[in-house]
Every structure is written in structure tokens, then in C-alpha cells.
Amino acid sequence: ASMLMIGSFIMIACHLSFAFLLPVFPSKVLAVAIIAILGVSFSLVPAALWPSVPKIIDERILGSAYCVIFWIQNWGLLLVPVVIGKVLDATGGYTLPMVIFSSFGVFALIFGLWLKREDKKKGYGLELPNIK
């Protein structure tokens, strides 16, 4: 859960940097650096999230749990580009879409905090290595 929270925080910072920092300080080097850091966050979040599923979900329904996760993810892949496209058409700028993307990071951060609390309460061992 800690890696999920760190990745979420980085994601929030990167998208807010695109929304508010780059328009004030336009720099290709800064933009590339932010993209590279955003790539790190996109690695940390799934690296923390996917291994936690079998630690939380009973083995009998693990396949169904992965099915639900992929189902939700695919709905997001369908709807988010449509929403962002409509926002871009309405506003003509990228500030609001970047704020929307950073809000996804906020939701992930809240989920990470909740997951960490549940781990502490129920002892899932989410911070422990998978191989002993």
C-alpha cells in the first residue's frame, strides 16, 4: 500500500505540474522530466496493486476478483477518453483534463490509505514480500 500511495502522490504532482507549472515555465526538458517521473508512478501503482489481490481475496474467488478488476479498468479505458475529449472540446485547453487526471491520483491515494488501514486491521501482509 505504501508504493501505491507514493505512486499516487507522484501522479498527482506530475499532472498538476502539467496543468500549472509548464504553462508558466515552458520547457521541453522540464516536460520530458515530468513525463519520465510520471512513468515511474505508472510503474509503482500497478506493482503495488496487483500483488495485493491474492493476499486479500480468497483463492476460491480470485479469478472472479481479477475479472471484476479488469472489467472496471476496461470501463475506465472506454469512458475516460470520451470525457476528456468532451472537456477539451468545451474548454479548449489542457488544464482541466490534467486536473481530472490528478483527481484520479487523489482517488488512488485515498484507496491506498484505506488499503493500508485495512492491512493494519486485518493483517493481510501487504507490505511483506510475496516470497519467503
PLM feature segments, named:
Residues S2-L49:
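C-terminal transmembrane helical hairpin of 12-TM major facilitator-type secondary transporters
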Residues F9, C67-W75:
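Transmembrane alpha-helical cores of Major Facilitator Superfamily
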Residues A19, V99-K132:
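Multi-pass alpha-helical transporter architecture, strongest
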Residues W50-I56:
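Intracellular helix-loop hinge segments at the cytoplasmic ends of transmembrane helices
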